[in-house]
From Swiss-Prot:
Any single GO BP term: leucyl-tRNA aminoacylation
Pfam families noted in UniProt: Anticodon_1, tRNA-synt_1_2, tRNA-synt_1g
Enzyme nomenclature, EC number: 6.1.1.4
Catalytic function, reaction form: tRNA(Leu) + L-leucine + ATP = L-leucyl-tRNA(Leu) + AMP + diphosphate
Residues that hold ATP according to the record: K585
Protein name: Leucine--tRNA ligase
Amino acid sequence: MEKTYNPQEIERKWQRNWQEKDAFKVSNEEYHKKYYDLVMFPYPSGTLHVGHVKNYVIGDVIARYKRMRGYNVMHPFGFDAFGLPAENAAIEKGNIHPEDWTMQNINIIRNQIKKLGISYNWEREVITCKEDYYKWTQWIFLQLYKNGLAYKKKAPVNWCPNCKTVLANEQVVNGKCERCGTVVEIKQLEQWYFKITDYAEKLLYDLEKLSGWPENVKIMQKNWIGKSVGAEVEFNLDNGKGSLRVFTTRPDTLWGVTFMALAPESPLVEELTTPENSEKVNQFLQRVSLQDRFKRTAEGAEKEGVFTGSYAINPVNGEKIPIYVANYILYEYGTGAIMAVPAHDQRDFEFAKKYDLPIRIVIMPEGDELTEENLEKAYIGEGVLVNSGEFTGLDNQTAIREVSQWLEDKKIGKVVTQYKLRDWLISRQRYWGAPIPVVYCEKCGVVPVPEKDLPVKLPRDVAFEPTGKSPLIDHPDFKETTCPKCGGKAKREVDTMDTFVDSSWYYLRYVNPKLEDKPFNKEDVDNWLPVDQYIGGVEHAILHLLYSRFITKVLKDLGYVSFDEPFKNLFTQGMIYRNGAKMSKSKGNVVSPEEMIEKYGTDALRTYILFMAPPERDAEWNDSGIEGTYRFLNKVWNTYMKIQDKIIHLENKPNYPLKNKSEKDLRRKLHQTIEKITSDIEGNFQFNTAVSSLMELLNELNSYLNNTDDKDWNLNLLKEFSEDFVLMLSPIAPHISEELWKNFGKDEFIFKASWPEIDKNALKAEEITLAVQINGKLRAQITVDVSLNEDEVKSYALEDDKVQKYISGKKIQKIIYVPKKIINIVVK
């Protein structure tokens, strides 16, 4: 055996051994005491940097630890392989197909992952762009379509002029495309949607079940779903040609409505604009269409609008009120129309001031007298109703309930629950995605592709030009087809599905990745799901996690699975920064894992990633840090080389004698560390303190070895210590641990060994340290044998030199002893 630590050689050896022996395989029949450990799969856009590596290492420590605790661990990996970057690469480079670009990157990343020693069961790999996967993504679409949960409609959508495709609301961040940062425009297009709004209440209510999720993620989902209870009120148009329906959470302010406002995107604008106002309205709409939708509706943005020429009638008092188009109204929220109460809503107040519209106070704060003349901003607090007909004098909270009931009684409104959540827009005008499995027949209309004809395959020979239309439009062999219903001529849907559809169910496919006649076997997924531990970035809190919860609930309702939440526990890891910024090629601050592995070894890289900060927090990369973890592992190696030959042939003895205090202290420290690291991993994955504890423990061992003549070493203690230490190290640094374990003559892989047991007796201290107070002030500390009785402890305290200094020549009135904690001596 090598006497010098050579991490690269050791790591290649054990990675080869694991692969040859299929070490991490688990069968579906091993679901008894199961543990499904899953890290969010990556998009294969290129090579990984150490920022990507963090969550894979976290997931691997958990997987290896759980195996040692006796669990059958499913720990699969795959690739979220459809998406724009592959298609953009084809457009930009002109000589590579998106599939080829994607598969090249997958091979690169797969090799990188294997060099990290991650214990994945590669037989379960899924790749979402392969036909054997997206066939079942299409199957899921068909199940939603058959059950009224997938539909097509024309609506204003978010359009990215750079990516040349539509975006779901969740993919727009501060008015910009989440992927490329381009300002998003609004277009009216026919698109496919999933009816996630049907599940809004379930998605909200079931957040309470998720006790193993971070609170901030649950709050983000709750806010995105955005439940509010209020009243829906009908405002008839004064021309008698219909009505405007508005939603309000403040029906108590109905008597303060002085105008109505429509979102610029609302189809009602065209209907309600009179001929004499059409030029002004169209000019306004043109100008607003160029504005960032989210900036224009932000709190401090300037409020602008134009009069449509139409009026509505306030149903509570019969007043005729003007209808405006206003830039601060969002079409997606509510009904796209609002009743404006300038006295009690700040945005309405600013608009009314600008256009000289009436402001009527209908809520008066108690003990104060507001007037329209002295009102400098909207009053939004609690108060008593004024100028509100029969409800005048009620406090506004009571009025909300009573006015809502009155509206229902008068049949001019009703109490409704509304959600900010909008249906999931899944159409994409791009090639590299799963084709939507429907055809359009002049005779039969929209016809779903029969399940037996799946998958609807992507053709390879397409032209990659970002025209704003799907490249599949110009592919006659793909587009032209026959109707599965009548056999006549038909055209295929040429849009593809949002890639979040692919990732909304992949955790199910891992259970049966090669099944050909269905996406998964119900019995198998019911045995293995929900995922016990899911690991990934908090940036997926709304998109991927919400969609996955939705799809799981749909599949449960349709009888395909027996659980309604996909992920029992969720851990969101922090990012790794360098030079104060997130790692990216454009910033030139990327740290390559290959370079670190070549220089320091995989185990040193893994150990540093875990040691640098609590795993949920962001951390700054520092080269000296990995140098430190390399030195630690080198010290582990050298220490084991020092003692190995003396203990290798020893049998493990359960109750060996400890000859002196240093041996007792070392064994106590060992079992304190087992207790601490077990707690660190079981509690909240505090791997940084686990690594720190191992470093401290190694120092204790070396202190014992250096301060004891080697002929006096307690070899039974060293045998127990060295085995338990390497067992605790193994989830963190598996390669060096496997090598040292083998050197102890062990035949099985170390992760198949049991996690060290805590000896509670070893934790008991033989000495205790007590605080000594004199007249209530701390004056000394004494260390005494734990077996001393109260009188002996008191005598020991009185003899202490520091205590003597404060009691000499004084009368002791009493001595109070709190066992194992404190002695208080009262003197006069």
